[in-house]
């Protein structure tokens, strides 16, 4: 996986994909900065009146349901439909799905009407979206939904059904991250517990995923693995530097973006802890 990850991240820097993010106002700044740090070019337009034009100029689309309202819903559907028409890969982050009827119905309508190259969320959100189960507390995954070494293969098998049904790649985040498509899955063991102590780490990871997919659209699963693991490595680097400085969560957030902007793809790949497996019968 290390060689594929280096190629994926190098492609991202070479292409500098214009990544159109319709995201939430809590984390838009961090998402834009982490995209710049990884080598992408962000545009954060969310006015329904212009999103079809903006997405037509873009290389990839990321839609994030964090702060939903009627305007952002209209913008999301308009941009995503146009992206599908133009063959521009779209990525969905179903933030907080399961917490409210409006949020859940919006996410399920998107699944019914839009083709997404990848879908990323915490385990609770993915479970609520895929199977109508899962416990949601704000935008944090419930402890009962945690993926562990003991159940990761069983969880991956369930996610495989979802990925196959919607012809997508699914990233379910947690202490262990799972990256699943219809044929294979990867367990990503990179990451820092400090990420759960700031708002926006998941949104940033999804933004990076969208950019990686945009720059590697023929290898979506590999792009998803590389993006997830590389962002996790940046979290580990940021945690170490924060502790060394005696810093807190604001320091960690800054160090996270610093790590993304200074670490070369080869260095990130050296630190990957990824296990890839093919599903039986494939």
Feature-to-residue mapping (PLM):
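Glycine-rich phosphate/adenosyl-contacting loop at the front of the ribokinase-like
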Residues: 1-44
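Short glycine/serine/threonine-rich phosphate/pyrophosphate-binding segments
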Residues: 25-32, 71-73, 100, 197, ...
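Active-site cofactor/substrate anionic-group-binding motifs, chiefly glycine-
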Residues: 34-87, 92
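Glycine/small-residue-rich loop that forms an oxyanion/phosphate-binding "nest" at active or ligand-binding sites
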Residues: 72-121
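Conserved phosphate/ATP/ADP-binding segment of small-molecule kinases
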Residues: 103-185
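Short pre-catalytic strand/loop immediately N-terminal to key active-site residues, enriched for Gly-Thr
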Residues: 188-200
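Conserved post-catalytic alpha-helical subdomain immediately downstream of the catalytic base
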Residues: 199, 208-254
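Charged C-terminal helix
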Residues: 233-282
